[in-house]
């Protein structure tokens, strides 16, 4: 075994040394007319045999550049705005200096002032913060992943996971429409697509009425290239010490009209952790009723598989069609051991102790599919699109549970549960975009959706030798949500000022049905509640020639309560119970945000934003205690309520130091005040708490092959109604390397290096006081390898002409 391991290490070292056996090619870029050095020029090295990109760099402020490549025959290409493209054939046999490479002046030379006015590196227009990738010479030789690292607020870790402002609740769109990609497909896309095929990246942190998305933000990648010919196959495996292992494969075939995309994956994970809870229940008079301590250890083993298939067909220059389908089943099980000690003081003194052990299973299934059709009336953004989506999911869990009591007497209680839920919904949307001038565009759309859900719970207890149904812990229910939505937005540019008002109309019908009730219970728990809301938005932005960007936005969102929150049907758990609240009203949210950002091409950016999010009728869960005959003791009872009013007021600071396209250091900080006011039983309750968080990220790409990332973060305690979440923090670091002309990539990522991650909550309601601490195996090392085969030939399109999304005007994005 030792010899085998030694041989493997020697072989790996040999591969690494071969992959990094590089020769150095240097030179200086100068103007042919006067010999003046040309800074920040794109220099690329391509294989003569097949034109595959091998290495690239940008010249420094003195025109000097340096490339690394294995020995071989290459074509050197130098390009810069205002100059003719320079090409030279090279045979590399060792380090060599090419001396001065002279560029001739081209026919289309733009002054620096004009470039800054029309296409700055960073800009804010309406709700969008844009990173104009096509104007960044230092990133042209990288990948889409490299470009995203430079978009304000966007982070991509070494595994390819994308976050925005530190949250993963973000949708990635490509050419103004949702990508519908799986996580692994998206990772492959951004890690292989050349950065020079991207026109710009648009970041939307406060979506307008145009978007029905529930995500915290949207990242829209707008390309300036069309896949002309492509046959691409990739496969790999990801693993971690948690443990987790997941193999996957992806295949893409394309020609000028048709693209076929197929993906399959599998996975196994094993999560372990522990949880500790202390809880005290009080009467309305403030007298202690009981005190309970729980300590749990659990493990969960899960398997998953999945597949994705899509077809994109360009019928002609004016019509295109996209079809897709995905399916993701998962299954597994877990064990749990909980030790409980409870001291009861009211209504009767009693000490209870037991150990609960369970062996559970779970099965889940998710599938969705749809089609997207677009008709382009011209190549200036005038288009009509229709989309239809269907989604179905189902699953359940259950198992046997044993409670071994040691007090007040020794006995065993055995019960089993079977819980399932399922849904089969659909949604259709039609959107019409029409530019009414070179500086303005109007968009209108209509969406209709239907989302039903069925729930089922069955509980049986062992009585003697027979399993007897527990009718109070068994039920069936059906919920439906029917929504109709329409929106209209207008965007107009007045020089550097962009104005975008919009409005969205939403009609919802929420229903619930309970076909069975408890013995002797004649209550009708069915409900049917309609809701209607109007959601206006306004986004203003202004930018100067010196790249000062100002923005001001207002949005109003109105959310109807969830179906389960409206039900009065009591859900009896083993030691507590809960109900909904049919008197819940809609939640109104008014958001106001103002910001300033200054961008420098050679430094990066500094930004400051102030925001206010005020809510009325926010839904929170209140926890009470009361005696219930089913338990014959005082237990916890919870139900949702509308908080009287709440608001969050904060200040965000972000700084990005970016001396080149392959290195950046970013600091993000958020300081905010959370205020909540409500009344319960005629008694007012008021909470006011300041919280803060910050994150420091470093990303670098070395020798065009090796990525290095590191991040540290901290979030202080936060407050909600009668509840406080404890602070959390951690440090991550990672490496990713490309080998063999990006045919193979390997990453290593260390998560929560010092094992600091733990989570906790405390509750301090009038009747329930509790603390809980939760810890899982967060410290881990993740590794992965990806192999890629194929070639992608890109046909660049003129920036002023047609884009894949329908050629919307620059900065408008078809929105």
Language-model segments: residues:
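Outer-membrane beta-barrel translocator/receptor signature
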Residues: 212-219, 227-278, 301-305
């Amino acid at each position: 075994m030792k010899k085998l391991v030694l041989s493997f290490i020697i072989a790996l070292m040999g591969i690494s040394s071969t992959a990094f056996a590089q020769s150095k090619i240097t030179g200086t870029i100068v103007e042919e007319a006067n010999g003046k050095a040309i800074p920040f020029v794109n220099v690329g090295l391509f294989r003569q045999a097949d034109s595959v990109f091998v290495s690239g760099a940008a010249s420094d402020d003195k025109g000097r550049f340096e490339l690394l490549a294995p020995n071989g025959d290459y074509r050197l290409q130098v390009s810069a705005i205002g100059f003719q493209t320079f090409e030279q054939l090279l045979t590399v046999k060792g380090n060599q200096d090419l001396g001065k490479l002279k560029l001739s002046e081209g026919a289309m030379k733009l002054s620096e002032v004009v470039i800054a006015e029309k296409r700055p590196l960073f800009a804010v227009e309406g709700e969008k913060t844009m990173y104009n990738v096509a104007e960044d010479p230092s990133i042209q030789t990288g990948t889409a992943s490299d470009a995203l690292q430079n978009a304000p607020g966007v982070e991509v870790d070494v595994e390819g996971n994308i976050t925005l402002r530190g949250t993963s609740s973000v949708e990635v769109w490509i050419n103004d429409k949702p990508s519908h990609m799986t996580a692994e497909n998206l990772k492959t896309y951004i890690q292989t697509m050349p950065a020079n095929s991207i026109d710009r990246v648009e970041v939307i942190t406060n979506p307008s009425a145009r978007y029905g998305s529930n995500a915290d933000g949207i990242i829209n990648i707008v390309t300036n290239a069309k896949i002309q010919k492509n046959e691409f196959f990739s496969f790999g495996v990801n693993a971690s010490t948690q443990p987790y292992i997941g193999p996957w494969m992806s295949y893409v075939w394309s020609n000028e009209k048709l693209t076929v995309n197929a993906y399959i994956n599998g996975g196994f994970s094993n999560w372990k952790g522990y949880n500790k809870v202390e809880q005290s229940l009080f009467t309305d008079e403030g007298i202690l009723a009981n005190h309970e301590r729980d300590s749990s250890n659990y493990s969960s083993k899960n398997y998953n598989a999945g597949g994705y298939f899509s077809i994109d067909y360009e019928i002609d220059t004016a019509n295109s069609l996209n079809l897709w389908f995905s399916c993701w089943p998962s299954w597994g099980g877990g064990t749990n051991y909980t030790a409980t000690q409870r001291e009861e003081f009211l209504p009767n003194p009693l000490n209870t102790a037991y150990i609960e052990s369970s062996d559970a299973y779970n099965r889940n299934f998710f599938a969705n599919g749809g089609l997207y059709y677009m008709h382009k009336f011209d190549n200036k953004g005038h288009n009509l699109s229709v989309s239809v989506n269907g989604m179905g999911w189902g699953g359940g869990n259950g198992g046997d549970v044993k409670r071994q009591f040691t007090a007040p007497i020794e006995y065993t209680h055995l019960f089993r549960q079977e819980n399932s839920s399922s849904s089969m919904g659909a949604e259709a949307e039609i959107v019409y975009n029409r530019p009414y001038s070179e500086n303005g565009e109007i968009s209108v759309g209509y969406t209709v959706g239907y989302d039903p859900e069925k729930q089922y719970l069955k509980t049986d207890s062992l009585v003697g030798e027979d399993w007897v149904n527990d009718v109070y812990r068994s039920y069936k229910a059906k919920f439906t949500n029917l929504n109709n939505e329409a929106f209209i937005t207008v965007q107009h540019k007045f020089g550097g000022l962009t104005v975008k008002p919009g409005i969205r109309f939403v009609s919802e019908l929420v229903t619930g049905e309970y076909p069975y009730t408890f013995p002797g219970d004649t209550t009708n728990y069915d409900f049917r509640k309609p809701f209607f809301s109007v959601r206006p938005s306004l986004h203003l932005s202004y930018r100067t020639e010196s790249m000062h960007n100002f923005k001001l936005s207002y949005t109003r969102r109105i959310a109807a309560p969830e179906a389960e929150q409206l039900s009065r049907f009591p859900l009896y758990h083993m030691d507590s119970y809960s109900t909904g609240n049919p008197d819940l009203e809609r939640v109104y949210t008014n958001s106001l945000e103002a910001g300033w950002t200054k961008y420098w091409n050679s430094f990066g950016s500094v930004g400051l934003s102030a925001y206010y999010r005020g809510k009325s009728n926010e839904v929170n869960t209140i926890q009470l205690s009361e005696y219930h005959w089913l338990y014959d003791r005082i237990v916890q009872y919870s139900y949702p309520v509308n908080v009287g009013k709440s608001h969050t007021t904060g200040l965000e600071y972000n700084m990005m130091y970016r001396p080149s396209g392959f290195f950046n250091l970013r600091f993000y900080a958020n300081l905010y005040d959370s205020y909540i006011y409500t009344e319960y039983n005629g008694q007012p309750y008021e909470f006011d708490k300041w919280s803060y968080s910050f994150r420091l990220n470093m990303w670098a790409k070395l020798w065009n092959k090796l990525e290095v990332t590191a991040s540290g973060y901290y979030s202080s305690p936060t407050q909600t109604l009668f509840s406080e979440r404890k602070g959390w923090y951690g440090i991550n670091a990672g490496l990713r390397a490309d080998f063999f002309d990006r045919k193979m990539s390997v990453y290593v990522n260390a998560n929560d290096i010092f094992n600091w991650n733990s989570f906790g909550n405390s509750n301090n309601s009038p009747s329930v006081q509790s603390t809980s601490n939760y810890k899982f195996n967060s410290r881990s090392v993740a590794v992965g390898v990806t192999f890629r085969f194929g070639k992608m030939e890109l046909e660049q399109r003129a920036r002023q002409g047609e884009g894949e999304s329908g050629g919307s005007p620059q900065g408008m994005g078809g929105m």
